[in-house]
């Protein structure tokens, strides 16, 4: 019988999901994106060659895998064509192996214009979006005014809807934000110059998934961003615009929650965050700078430096609750090599003196929160590219064990380098 496994970030994103998805895709028939858009940046390194995927599922690098983009993904036609072009230039067959739900909302130039205008207007209070139009596209979806992939099949009706939407957006862009309007004809022409390519990949993703389940094949759901950026459960309002958690699998693909067999949460051995928002264990000293340097902590999509801090078991406990996580993959263990001591945040001290073991929901409730740390000895030995558990230093094993105890979930996979081969699978999610 086939297994259905979801892989998602259990922190603030950038945990290393792309590598692990790619690692496990040799076991599956389908890899599915179910939320987000081209704001994701999944970095894969295979035999030393680096690939960054933003929209197309990471399974595209395996010839035997069919990649699906579910209805929960907001689709930029421009970004899709650019990414397809990059892959096809390397000889990768995308068009025959990528299927797209007709219910995907489209990201169009006015979404990007609005995203930039709003962030500029917010100034120092900006959310820290990637500026790719993700939020405005999801707004249109919820407001029931958005254009979807299915609208590409009728150009006349599409043009009529586009005109109404542009009137709405351009009024705000010109009169409120004082920026240039988006041109109707150029937008229409640009979309329909590539519409036929997209239409050729449209499929009933939900039916494909349920048939795959019946046929007993393995399916992998690839999450983007991280749990603490979820629109409902993250550090609101400093969040993304989609459900990054396990519940998003069902709503973003039409694959019911009872069909998931295993949820793999990806965690770094420390914590990072990009953009604004609360981050209790953030380090502002030389240790934080050294983690950032050794971990090469710069965003795959934006290039922005990531904020770095100690492992936060409080935030990860919340991720375990929300996602029903079955097991963890811990990445970047090797980045902690050489530190004399390491700290793990085990609880938060709230401004009123209360000690809590689960993270608050809203960003405002994190104000004045202090981390309570447990200090553990570090290790001087090298863990980079170690692929056998017994070859890890005892202090590293103790560190992993303590995290397992604090969050109540086992570490089933360990990553000790960026390449897919630099990994230990202690318990295979597809055999669990």
Swiss-Prot record:
GO cellular component assignments: cytoplasm
Catalyses which reaction(s): IMP + L-aspartate + GTP = N(6)-(1,2-dicarboxyethyl)-AMP + GDP + phosphate + 2 H(+)
Binding site residues for Mg(2+): 14, 41
Signal peptide: none
Record key words, sorted: Cytoplasm, GTP-binding, Ligase, Magnesium, Metal-binding, Nucleotide-binding, Purine biosynthesis
Binding site for GTP: 13-19, 41-43, 306, 332-334, 415-417
GO MF: adenylosuccinate synthase activity; GTP binding; magnesium ion binding
Cofactor: Mg(2+)
Protein EC: 6.3.4.4
Active site residues per record: 14 (proton acceptor), 42 (proton donor)
Binding sites annotated in the UniProt record for IMP: 14-17, 39-42, 130, 144, 225, 240, 304
Involved pathway(s): Purine metabolism; AMP biosynthesis via de novo pathway; AMP from IMP: step 1/2
Pfam family, one: Adenylsucc_synt
Source domain of life: Bacteria
Main EC class the enzyme belongs to: ligase
Name the UniProt record assigns to this protein: Adenylosuccinate synthetase
């Amino acid at each position: 019988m086939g297994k259905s496994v979801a892989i998602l970030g259990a922190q603030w994103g950038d945990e290393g999901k792309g590598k692990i998805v790619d690692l496990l895709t040799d076991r599956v028939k389908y890899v599915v994106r179910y939320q987000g858009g081209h704001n994701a940046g999944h970095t894969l390194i295979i035999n030393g060659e680096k690939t960054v995927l933003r929209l197309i599922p990471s399974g595209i690098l395996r010839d035997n895998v069919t990649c699906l983009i579910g209805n929960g993904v907001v689709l930029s036609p421009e970004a899709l064509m650019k990414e397809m072009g990059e892959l096809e230039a390397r000889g990768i067959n995308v068009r025959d192996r990528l299927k797209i739900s007709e219910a995907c909302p489209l990201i169009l130039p006015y979404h990007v214009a609005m995203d930039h205008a709003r962030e500029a207007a917010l100034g120092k209070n900006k959310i820290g979006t990637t500026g790719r139009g993700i939020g405005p596209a999801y707004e249109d979806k919820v407001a029931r005014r958005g254009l979807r992939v299915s609208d590409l099949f009728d150009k006349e009706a599409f043009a009529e809807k586009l005109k109404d939407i542009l009137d709405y957006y351009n009024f705000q862009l010109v009169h409120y934000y004082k920026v240039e309007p988006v041109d109707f004809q150029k937008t229409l022409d640009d979309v329909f110059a590539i519409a036929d390519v997209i239409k050729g990949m449209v499929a009933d993703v939900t039916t494909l998934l349920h048939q795959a389940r019946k046929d007993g094949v393995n399916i992998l759901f690839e999450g983007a961003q991280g749990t603490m950026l979820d629109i409902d459960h993250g550090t609101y309002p400093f969040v993304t615009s989609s459900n990054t958690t396990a519940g998003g699998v069902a709503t973003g693909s039409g694959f019911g929650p009872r069909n998931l067999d295993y949820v793999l949460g990806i965690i770094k051995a420390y914590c990072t965050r990009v953009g604004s928002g609360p981050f209790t264990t953030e380090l502002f000293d030389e240790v934080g700078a050294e983690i950032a340097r050794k971990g090469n902590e710069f965003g795959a999509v934006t290039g922005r430096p990531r904020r770095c801090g100690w492992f936060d078991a409080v935030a990860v406990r919340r991720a375990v609750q929300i996602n029903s996580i079955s097991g963890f993959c811990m990445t970047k263990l090797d980045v902690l090599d050489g530190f004399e001591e390491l700290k793990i945040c085990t609880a938060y001290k709230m401004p009123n003196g209360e000690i809590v073991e689960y993270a608050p929901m809203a960003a405002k409730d994190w104000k004045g929160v202090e981390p309570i740390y447990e200090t553990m000895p570090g290790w001087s030995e090298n863990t980079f590219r170690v692929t056998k558990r017994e070859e890890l230093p005892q202090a590293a094993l103790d560190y992993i064990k303590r995290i397992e105890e604090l969050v109540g979930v086992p570490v089933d996979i360990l990553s000790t380098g960026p390449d897919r081969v630099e990994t230990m699978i202690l318990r295979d999610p597809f055999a669990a």
